[in-house]
């Protein structure tokens, strides 16, 4: 195959902008090992402005090229794009719609599957429709006296709840509530991040994660890894990325073969059922009674030095650069 002009688009301007840049570093290092890849890294900010690493203003046009603000510089044709954008507008599916419109091949899930997974309400509807157990919840579409009363009743019934902004990732807009005193302020904060909110029953369980991805025409689900948080905490945004995080990770969780196989089967079922593409990290709860509950799907999981997806893929025996390049090549050949 001849040289591939690959656009590594990162940032996005949302709450996870900085994490997206860290993931882009990892991807850039991995792709540097492939001589056929001619990579241009471009950062997208919250105002929709594109800028190269050396500060040049540019834009991605409908002619599938990067056009630079300096008119004397020739446009850079784009063969393929990796939208390394956590949260909006990447994992929400927005930017993939534009790629489809201009017929530009891209890495990762398409617009519809990204949107369905990112919105916690639609995701849970899909989980239930596919017959995959998930956490009990209620759905709120407005902050008013009725929704406050519903949430108070949920807290009374379940003892402890999570209030979550429906359209955020990396635990942004996610609050554990154990008393009525915290309830209204947590709802207000969650609604400040999203017009829709879900209230979930707190599950006292182990947090397990699976890397589910495509390789050589097959869907692979790794053995589950585990996130171990300090007592009475959850895997918040700060716990994920703070330098002083007390959370620990295990690339392989200590679970029975039966539990591991069931989790892998659920992961493949939702990957196929929700028509995901190329990569995902699928998160589960495992209760003391060995009940498995699907928590969420990340359609563009973190690829930082501490992220679980590349670690689990490597532990499964797959080289990340080979996996990435194989998907790029197969997609371009079939395009």
UniProtKB/Swiss-Prot annotation:
Instruction: Name its pathway.
Output: Cell wall biogenesis; peptidoglycan biosynthesis
Q: Tell me how the cofactor is bound.
A: Binds 2 magnesium or manganese ions per subunit.
Names of the cofactor(s)? Mg(2+); Mn(2+)
Q: Does the keyword Ribosomal protein apply?
A: no
Any one GO BP annotation for this protein: peptidoglycan biosynthetic process
Kindly list the positions annotated as binding Mg(2+) 1.
Answer: 283, 296
| All residue ranges annotated as the ATP-grasp domain in the record | 124-329
Listed under catalytic activity are:
2 D-alanine + ATP = D-alanyl-D-alanine + ADP + phosphate + H(+)
A GO molecular-function descriptor: D-alanine-D-alanine ligase activity
Q: Please tell me one Gene Ontology term that the record gives under cellular component.
A: cytosol
Residues reported in the UniProt entry to bind ATP? 154-209
The domain of life for this entry's organism is Bacteria
Q: Which UniProt keywords apply?
A: ATP-binding, Cell shape, Cell wall biogenesis/degradation, Cytoplasm, Ligase, Magnesium, Manganese, Metal-binding, Nucleotide-binding, Peptidoglycan synthesis
Q: Which Pfam families match?
A: Dala_Dala_lig_C, Dala_Dala_lig_N
EC number(s)? 6.3.2.4
Known InterPro entries for this protein? ATP-grasp (IPR011761), ATP_grasp_subdomain_1 (IPR013815), D-Ala_lig_Van_CS (IPR000291), D_ala_D_ala (IPR005905), Dala_Dala_lig_C (IPR011095), Dala_Dala_lig_N (IPR011127), PreATP-grasp_dom_sf (IPR016185)
Give the residues the record marks as binding Mg(2+) 2: 296, 298
Task: Tell me the HAMAP family matching this sequence.
Answer: Dala_Dala_lig (MF_00047)
- Function field: Cell wall formation.
What family classification does the UniProt entry report for this protein?
A: Belongs to the D-alanine--D-alanine ligase family.
What's the protein here called? D-alanine--D-alanine ligase
């Amino acid at each position: 195959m001849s040289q591939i002009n690959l656009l590594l688009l990162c940032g996005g301007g949302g709450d996870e902008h900085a994490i997206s840049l860290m993931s882009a570093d990892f991807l850039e290092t991995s792709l540097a090992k492939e001589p056929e890849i001619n990579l241009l890294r471009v950062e997208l900010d919250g105002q929709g402005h594109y800028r190269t690493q050396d500060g040049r203003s540019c834009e991605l046009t409908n002619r599938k090229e990067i056009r630079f603000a300096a008119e004397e510089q020739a446009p850079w044709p784009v063969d393929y794009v990796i939208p390394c954008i956590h949260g909006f507008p990447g994992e929400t599916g927005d930017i993939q719609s534009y790629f489809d419109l201009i017929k530009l091949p891209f890495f990762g899930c398409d617009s519809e599957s990204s949107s369905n997974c990112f919105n916690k309400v639609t995701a849970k509807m899909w989980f239930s429709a596919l017959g995959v157990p998930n956490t009990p919840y209620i759905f709120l579409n407005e902050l008013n006296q009725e929704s406050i009363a519903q949430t108070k009743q949920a807290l009374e019934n379940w003892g402890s709840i999570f209030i979550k902004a429906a359209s955020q990732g990396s635990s942004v807009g996610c609050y554990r509530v154990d008393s009525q005193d915290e309830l209204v302020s947590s709802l207000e904060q969650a609604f400040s991040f999203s017009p829709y909110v879900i209230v979930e029953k707190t599950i006292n369980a182990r947090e397990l994660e699976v890397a589910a991805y495509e390789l050589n025409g097959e869907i692979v689900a790794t053995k589950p890894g585990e996130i171990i948080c300090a007592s009475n905490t959850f895997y918040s945004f700060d716990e994920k990325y703070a330098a002083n995080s007390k959370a620990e990770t295990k690339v392989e969780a200590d679970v029975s073969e039966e539990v591991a196989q069931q989790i892998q089967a659920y992961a493949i079922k939702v990957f196929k059922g929700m028509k995901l593409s190329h990569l995902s990290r699928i998160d589960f709860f495992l209760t003391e009674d060995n009940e498995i509950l699907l928590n969420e799907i990340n359609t563009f999981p973190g690829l930082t030095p501490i992220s679980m997806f590349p670690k689990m893929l490597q532990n499964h025996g797959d080289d990340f650069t080979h996996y990435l390049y194989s998907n790029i090549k197969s997609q371009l050949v079939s395009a």
